[in-house]
């Protein structure tokens, strides 16, 4: 906690007066055993990133009014037996590969949508997937997706408040195209 406060304090001069901070904390496992003889500090490394929240939020605000283009990429979501999707980690090269693929598509506001290894909708590279149709929110089964605060808020709070049903199921790309 002290390190976060120290980082924010050192970065204050780079922020505008009313900026909110987006803090990302990455912790590595430390050196692999093959490097045990290297003469450096052993143990985990902590990286604290601090940047203005407006860099992401401000650039996305128009999407709430105009929507975005979902692009199904050739990059698949990593199945749960290889990496537990309940672990929110920052080491997701497959997300980067999907985003690079989408960045090559003509147009703007293109966002990657990944399929699971069976060809069903899994998730975006930084988002859960929800589709509203006939008073029902459809979302992928939780097998290969990050289950977190956003998903729980939509399912447990937002859907009931709006009188919407929620169905967790395998969603085919065809279902999204309709």
Enumerate the predicted regions with their spans:
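Helix-start/capping segments and mature chain N-termini
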Residues: 1-10, 33-178
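Glycine-rich, N-terminal phosphate-binding loop and its surrounding beta-alpha-beta segment
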Residues: 1-20, 26
């Amino acid at each position: 906690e002290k390190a976060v406060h120290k980082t924010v304090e050192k970065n204050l001069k780079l922020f505008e007066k009313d900026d909110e901070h987006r803090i990302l904390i990455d912790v590595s496992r430390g050196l692999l055993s093959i490097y045990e003889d290297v003469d450096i500090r052993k143990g985990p490394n902590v990286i604290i990133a601090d940047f203005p929240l407006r860099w992401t939020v401000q650039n996305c605000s128009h999407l709430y009014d105009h929507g975005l283009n979902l692009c199904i990429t050739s990059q698949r979501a990593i199945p749960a037996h290889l990496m537990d999707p309940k672990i929110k980690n920052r080491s997701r090269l497959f997300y980067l590969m999907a985003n690079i693929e989408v960045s090559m598509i003509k147009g703007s506001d293109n966002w990657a949508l990944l399929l699971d290894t069976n060809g069903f909708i899994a998730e975006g590279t930084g988002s859960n997937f929800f589709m509203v149709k006939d008073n029902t929110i459809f979302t992928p089964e939780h097998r290969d997706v990050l289950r977190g605060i956003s998903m729980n808020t939509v399912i447990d709070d937002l859907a009931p408040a709006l009188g919407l049903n929620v169905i967790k199921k395998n969603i085919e790309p065809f279902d999204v195209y309709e």
